[in-house]
Amino acid sequence: MSAGTLTRADIASRINQQIGLSRNESAAIVESILDHMSDALAAGQNVKISGFGTFVLRDKAQRIGRNPKTGVEVPILPRRVMTFRASQSMRARVAGK
């Protein structure tokens, strides 16, 4: 595993080691899962993975912002944002409880 960051390759390698699929098959599974999640999010669906967390989409309305250098008001356009909410069990695991 890479120091500090878990990558797609790390996940595929772990699947390869634990399940015994080939590296190519493991990488294809990882890509398929991530593609499916991305497609669902792009279609406006939230993605919930039990025991892990939920990727939540939220629509933000237009609002007025301010240029910090000039102080001039500028409109911030409406947009959709994605956040991740970790499950209770994931929060406890990360906290070491």
Curated annotation (Swiss-Prot):
| Gene Ontology MF, one | DNA binding
Q: Which UniProt keywords apply?
A: DNA recombination, DNA-binding, Transcription, Transcription regulation, Translation regulation
Q: How does it assemble?
A: Heterodimer of an alpha and a beta chain.
Q: What does the function comment of this entry state?
A: This protein is one of the two subunits of integration host factor, a specific DNA-binding protein that functions in genetic recombination as well as in transcriptional and translational control.
Please give the family membership noted in the entry. Belongs to the bacterial histone-like protein family.
Q: Which SUPFAM superfamilies match?
A: IHF-like DNA-binding proteins (SSF47729)
| Single GO BP term | regulation of translation
**Descriptive protein name:** Integration host factor subunit alpha
The answer to whether keyword Transcription regulation applies is: yes
User: Mind telling me which GO cellular component terms the entry cites?
Assistant: cytosol
Q: Which gene encodes it?
A: ihfA
By its UniProt entry, which NCBIfam families does this protein fall under?
A: himA (TIGR00987), PRK00285.1 (NF001401)
Read off the Pfam families from this record. Answer: Bac_DNA_binding
Source domain of life is Bacteria
